Amino acid sequence: MKTKISALLLVLFIFSNNVFADFSVIGSLERKINSYIVSLQEEKDKNLKEGENKENTNETTNEENADEEVISENTAKEDVLKKPVLERREPTVSYSSLPNKSYGWYFRHPSKLNSGLPAGAGDVESSLVKKYNGIWQHPKDYKVVYITFDEGYEYNNNTTRILDIAKQKGVKFNFFVTGAYIKDRPDLVLRMINEGHTVGNHTNKHSNGPKALNVSNQKLINDITQAEVLYKNLTGQDFMPYMRPPEGAFSERELAIVRDLGYRSVFWSFAYADWDTGKQPSKSHALSKITGELHNGSVILLHAVSTTNTEILPDIIDNILKRGYKVETLDKIPSYE
């Protein structure tokens, strides 16, 4: 625009200095130049305004896109994490009014190995467990099994190997950890969560529930909630809503307290003597025992300290899958409530 204006001014200068120039022509030319300059300035202002509007529009669009990306990212994170939340209940009765008669969970082995027959349990014990929404096997005749590991302490780096096997086989397990285990092996607890396994409460000090209640109701509550605090400080989230009573010991009062704290008590329909690290069963005996008692809806209790369990675990999983069972997590078991 500057070049055009300079050229016009030069013409005006020549005319104004030419003695033969017609002054009326010069005046007319000057008016045209001024008009042209005004039109150029208006065009410049218009272009500048349109540019600013376009820039503002682009900025707004970019901001909106950025907001959408953040929302999308946050939604994705929420979908992946889906953090569990323990739902506490207000007691409907005084806990002290409930009996603290101690029971030891047990199940009846099938009469014949490899029969696929379900395990049995005591009528009183199983009725109490059901009354308080507990678990000991899937209530329906589904071809699924639930492999659970109790984690009181780490031994021989077995849990690392167990997690490696789960990843190799593409299955998920259910772990019950004590407060001591959380403090001792936070790395493995985090790995359990990150790899999609269920992690439940096994109390802080592995206390026998009815014995703790003989001291006070609060003693049992503290043992459960202290483990919760350790777990939440480490992971930033609650336990999954499952608790395994140490030693399989329980009472009606214990079951009520556990339920009101937001958990389902988890027992089992298969277990065997695998917990003594100095007296391990042979691999052939263990494999025959575990796979021989497979049945629909079985909740299998294994101890991670067992080196035998760890060594035969790939064969256990292969046998389970070959026979048409699915290996699932406890959240697939329906509630009784």
Question: Where do the language-model regions lie?
Answer:
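Terminal accessory/targeting
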Residues: M1-V145, K167-G170, N296-E337
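Catalytic domains of cell-wall/extracellular-matrix polysaccharide-remodeling enzymes
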Residues: R161, K183-D184, S207-E337
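Short acidic/polar alpha-helix capping motifs at helix-coil junctions
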Residues: Y95-N100, V124-K130, F149-N156, S216-D223, ...
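Residue-identity detector for threonine
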Residues: T3, T57-T61, T75, T92, ...
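Generic signature of intrinsically disordered, low-complexity segments enriched in small/polar residues
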Residues: S16-N18, F23-I26, S39, L98, ...
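Active-site beta->alpha N-cap acidic-glycine motif
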Residues: Y103-A212, E228-K232, Q237-M240, K326, ...
